[in-house]
Amino acid sequence: MRRSAITLESEISDTERNALFAVMKNLSLKGTHLEIGTAAGGTLCEIYNFYKSSDREIPNFWVVDPMQYFPDQLDIVKKNLISNGVNLASVRFLESLSSIAIKKAFIENPVFDFILIDGSHKRKYVTQDLIWTRFLKKGGILCAHDYSSRFPGVQKSIDLFLKKYKNYKLISVTESLIVIRKMDTTKSSEITNMMMITAAVDGFIHQIRSSINKRVSTKNSHT
């Protein structure tokens, strides 16, 4: 059982959340908030409580998660939200992989003020998650957790995204939370097919290298 399933706490540290809220308090983010990867719903609860404690309008939320992180995840998430005063009617759950859930977005064309990516650490999936930025409004906030050298799939995906899309501005990096603002609309859609192919190939190569290194390490330990 994952620790967050027991504690129901956010997997984002207090320091990271405080840095995020320091940015958010100076912005008017009244539109829908998207969370990709929710664990036990702890971070959503923290964001909700931030708005409530600062007497701000509480936005609606979308949660994208296959709900397979730990047993009974969806039920645990809902109970956690309710215990924190969150009205479940304001939360839309898309219980599927990000790559599947986004098909609904292409049909409905939503607009998000805030996107938090905290799902798979593999480069292929982080790149897929970044497709959701097509629906992030000008002036909106994009965050990604586990942005560090410990998770090269996350770090490389975000770095390449910022390098390609100059209309996104790096605001802060605190521990492993990166905060980015969309300063202008994107002339062409975020994340091209070539970027997806490159991410998949790069991830495959990384997996092979990791497997080889692990085997070599195991072999050396027995010699």
Describe the function of each predicted region:
Residues 2-7, 11, 17-223:
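S-adenosylmethionine/decaboxylated-SAM
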